[in-house]
Amino acid sequence: MPTKIQIVFYSSYGHIYKMAEAIAAGAREVGDVEVTLLQVPELMPEEVQVKSGIKGYRAAFGSIPYATPEVLAEADAIIFGTPTRFGNMCSQMRNFLDQTGGLWMSGGLIGKVGSVFTSTASQHGGQETTITSFHTTLLHHGMVIVGVPYSEPGLTNMTEISGGTPYGASTLAGADGSRQPSENELQIARFQGKHVATIAKRLANNK
């Protein structure tokens, strides 16, 4: 039976979606895994989406199905992606996680691997606090937290401004959202996907 990896994300302008695709590519490098991308529902009123331009950007990944709390229980590992909002996860992701009380009651996520990636507008925009505060919810669910070890050389790349932390992959979008994930950031994301899948497979095989 394949090890099941879910990548559950929210993306406004596509940066987190691009990182999610890179993470999925890395996870698929591990043999006998099944990788599924899922997004969480939008909360923003449609008129605000149109005015801000988000609606157009989100159309690029509109075909990706929405996650439900029940579906999470089917995974061996879940990698969550969220943009930063004032050093925390976005409201869309928080709203989704607040619906997982039933899973908490049943212990449905205990022992599953949990991991997080993020994006910020600026270099010091709260990447690390977003990921580590997200970990609190995963730990309440009894998940096994996995980050990005320093065996990934992109974490110590000093030749460019780049996201990427030992807590999880990250990217910088710029104040206007014009900066796209760099190759270094995408490589860290691919590493995270492969690393999580490897550990999840090992744990699943030892059940």
From Swiss-Prot:
Keywords assigned by UniProt, alphabetized: Flavoprotein, FMN, NADP, Oxidoreductase
GO molecular function: flavin adenine dinucleotide binding; FMN binding; NAD binding; NAD(P)H dehydrogenase (quinone) activity; NADP binding; p-benzoquinone reductase (NADPH) activity
A GO biological-process term: generation of precursor metabolites and energy
InterPro entries in UniProt: Flavodoxin/NO_synth, Flavoprotein-like_sf, Flavoprotein_WrbA-like, FMN_Rdtase-like_dom, NQO
Reactions it catalyzes: 1,4-benzoquinone + NADPH + H(+) = hydroquinone + NADP(+)
Pathway(s) it belongs to: Xenobiotic degradation; 4-nitrophenol degradation
Subunit structure: Homodimer.
Name recorded for this polypeptide: p-benzoquinone reductase
Gene source species: Pseudomonas sp. (strain WBC-3)
